[in-house]
UniProtKB/Swiss-Prot annotation:
Residues 1-61 form the TGS domain. Its cofactor is Zn(2+). GO terms for cellular component: cytosol. This is Threonine--tRNA ligase. It catalyses: tRNA(Thr) + L-threonine + ATP = L-threonyl-tRNA(Thr) + AMP + diphosphate + H(+). GO terms for biological process: threonyl-tRNA aminoacylation. Binds 1 zinc ion per subunit. Its EC number is 6.1.1.3. Pfam families: HGTP_anticodon (PF03129), TGS (PF02824), tRNA-synt_2b (PF00587), tRNA_SAD (PF07973). Gene3D superfamilies: 3.10.20.30, 3.30.54.20, Anticodon-binding domain (3.40.50.800), Bira Bifunctional Protein, Domain 2 (3.30.930.10), Threonyl-trna Synthetase, Chain A, domain 2 (3.30.980.10). Residues 243-534 are annotated as: Catalytic. Coiled coil: none annotated. Belongs to the class-II aminoacyl-tRNA synthetase family. The gene is thrS.
């Protein structure tokens, strides 16, 4: 007689084993209709799985995040159902849930077209609208293998042979005549899977290995209701308009080319933004009392072996040989900073020692993962390392956290999600070291009243880390900042200081990045602002235009004056109509467009309008320059009169 305890503390007693669906029905028919699955003693279970002992139960509906993930996973099965009806010869590989949706990798000789995807989506919807029940059957390993062998599903057989123990009892989910294998849970009925859209098709190697066959990957998105689906599709349309690759080309900020995959060619205006970010971070480094250093781009393999990178990170490192020595181009800056720390005797009085670098790093990312500025092979990190004592860890980590929040606020990012990544399988150091490091970061977060979630196994190989994920105007998540605690690397590389009792001690090392990759952060900013950078970041802050040739000399004088004031300004003296010039520079997203005619020249004024078409009227040249200088100095996010 299981006693079921619900989240509100109430209890319900049943004479026989019950399913989550039974409990939901006992509470009310409305809840039963909405029930997707159950969380039984903290573990997600199918709505029809029987509960045989006293348990805590939370009923999962489409209002829960887990409910939406489950229906997305079931939509992947629905996609498989439809594909097998339309192309029975298809061999199904894997169909997991991803952010906002799902995909299925399929082996099909016929290359899917846009028209095929539209037809496939219609077939999926027609199937879902029959509201058929999804039937789960738990079978033996051999029964599962026989089922897929009879259907010629070689990829499912490979998964069973290579990934699932023969003692296991896999779950097969029956979608009418279609069968799929999964840990689950899945929806009990396809009425939950009617708000979806197939998005695209791409190539994907089986198991992500380029030595294997290239499959077709069909992507889809799925939501709890029509409104949520529509909102997401509108957001995607807006994201496409803001695509940094498109805007970067329109504004002539940078380019990339096949001869240097994953490497950025910065053009003048893009490099201007890069330098402004560097300048801003340098000011922050001064406020928080950092040294700035510069380490070599390439170091001997021996050093990377001592640091542990060669063993744990070699596949991501570019290497070269010279005079019978093997070198690695640095993927990160930390080993170099330890070498700088090791020069000269350090005392406890020298700690904390905060060392920062705009470090040029390279990582051998897979070519298929490269994506504009967001995923590159060559990048610049606003990297820093703090060498301190155990007693200083809490204060130093707290200062790093405050620096992250101060910096993000300047760009208008105030929705920050914090995650704590803990020890991975491949790591250096013993469990005691990892316990101390993880506990120290947890305490620092608690001291700053910061809510966080734990990401088990996602830490760096040398230490746990706090990850700061900012959410942009489209509510997309971008993981940028990190604060990592490291007891291992200083030991491996022989870093020591003289303690107060004259003993030699190993410092604790805090790894800290705020923007992360400057290249990636610029990509994020391009999309956040849709190319309309705040004045302080804008490559060109002011453009001055004449109406006739009579004002040309005065316009050049104005631009010279602005440049002397530290304002990035240019002139447009072309023999074009003023409306044409205004439109062109509006498309270039220049914050301020200044027009000079005879009257403005006579009165030493400028007619000012913003890139958004707001007419600020006529202003004295000195007054306007003072306003702009203040905007730049304050790093204001808004233009005048906004």
């Amino acid at each position: 007689m299981p006693i079921i305890t619900l989240p509100d503390g109430s209890k319900r007693e049943f004479a026989n084993p019950v399913s989550t669906l039974d409990v939901a029905l006992d509470i009310g028919p409305g809840l039963a209709k909405a029930c997707i699955a159950g969380r039984v003693n903290g573990e997600l279970k199918d709505a029809t799985d029987l509960i045989t002992a006293d348990s805590e139960l939370a009923i999962i509906t489409a209002k829960d995040e887990e409910g939406v993930e489950i229906l997305r996973h079931s939509c992947a099965h629905l996609l498989g159902h439809a594909i097998k009806q339309m192309w029975p010869e298809t061999k199904m590989a894997i169909g997991p849930v991803i952010d906002n949706g799902f995909y299925y990798d399929i082996d099909l000789d016929h290359k899917l077209t846009h028209e095929d995807i539209e037809a496939l989506e219609k077939r999926m919807l027609a199937l879902a609208k029959t509201n058929y029940d999804v039937v789960k059957k738990v079978v033996s390993w051999q029964e599962a293998r026989d089922a897929f062998d009879g259907r010629g599903e070689e990829y499912k057989i490979a998964i069973l042979d290579e990934n699932i123990s023969k003692d296991a009892t896999p779950a097969l989910y029956h979608h009418e005549e279609y069968i799929d294998m999964c840990r689950g849970p899945h929806v009990p009925n396809m009425r939950f899977c009617q708000n979806f859209k197939l998005m695209s098709v791409a190539g994907a190697y089986w198991r992500g290995n380029s030595d294997n066959k290239m499959l077709q990957r069909v992507y889809g998105t799925a939501w709890a209701d029509k409104k949520a689906l529509k909102t997401h599709l509108v957001r995607l349309e807006e994201a496409a308009k803001r695509d940094h690759r498109k805007i970067g080309k329109q504004l002539d900020l940078y380019h990339m080319q096949e001869e240097a995959p994953g490497m950025v060619f910065w053009h003048n205006d893009g490099w201007s933004i890069f330098l402004e970010l560097e300048k801003f971070i340098r000011q922050k480094l001064g406020q928080y009392t950092y040294q700035e250093v510069k380490g070599p781009l390439m170091m001997d393999r021996v050093l990377w072996e001592r640091s542990g990178h060669w063993d744990k990170y070699a596949e991501a490192m570019f290497t070269t040989n010279s005079e019978n020595r093997e070198y690695a181009i640095k993927p990160m800056n930390c080993p170099g900073h330890v070498q700088i720390f090791n020069q000269g005797l350090k005392s406890y009085r020298d700690l904390p020692l905060r060392m920062a670098e705009f470090g040029c790093c390279h990582r051998n990312e897979p070519s298929g993962s490269l994506h504009g500025l967001m995923r590159v092979r060559g990048f610049t990190q606003d990297d820093a390392h703090v060498f301190c004592t155990d007693d200083q860890v809490q204060e130093e980590v707290s200062a790093c956290i405050q620096m992250v929040y101060d910096t993000y606020a300047t760009f208008g990012f105030d929705n920050i999600v914090v995650k704590l990544s803990t020890r991975p399988e491949k790591r250096i150091g013993d469990d005691d070291m990892w316990d101390r490091a993880e506990d120290a970061l947890k305490q620092a977060l608690a001291n700053n009243n910061i809510k966080y979630e734990i990401l088990p196994g996602e830490g760096a190989f040398y230490g746990p880390k706090i990850e700061f994920t900012l959410h942009d105007c489209l509510d997309r998540a971008w993981q940028c900042g990190t604060v990592q605690l490291d007891y291992a690397l200083p030991t491996r590389l022989g870093a020591t200081y003289v303690a107060e009792d004259n003993s030699r001690q190993t410092p604790v090392m805090i790894h800290r990045a705020i923007l992360g990759s400057l290249e990636r952060f610029i990509g994020i900013l391009i999309e956040e602002y849709a190319g309309k950078f705040p004045t302080w970041l804008a490559p060109m802050q002011v453009v001055v235009m004449n109406i006739t040739d009579k004002q040309a000399d005065y316009v050049e004088e104005i631009v010279k004056f602005f440049k002397e004031q530290g304002i990035r300004a240019s002139f447009d003296l072309r023999n074009e109509k003023i409306g044409f010039k205004i439109r062109e520079h509006t498309l270039r997203r220049v914050p301020y467009l200044l027009v000079v005619g005879d009257q403005e020249m006579e009165n030493k004024e400028v007619a000012v309008r913003t890139r958004d078409g707001i007419d600020l009227g006529k202003l004295k040249l000195e007054d306007f320059a003072a306003m702009i200088r203040q905007q730049i100095s304050l790093r204001s996010l808004k233009l005048l009169e906004e």
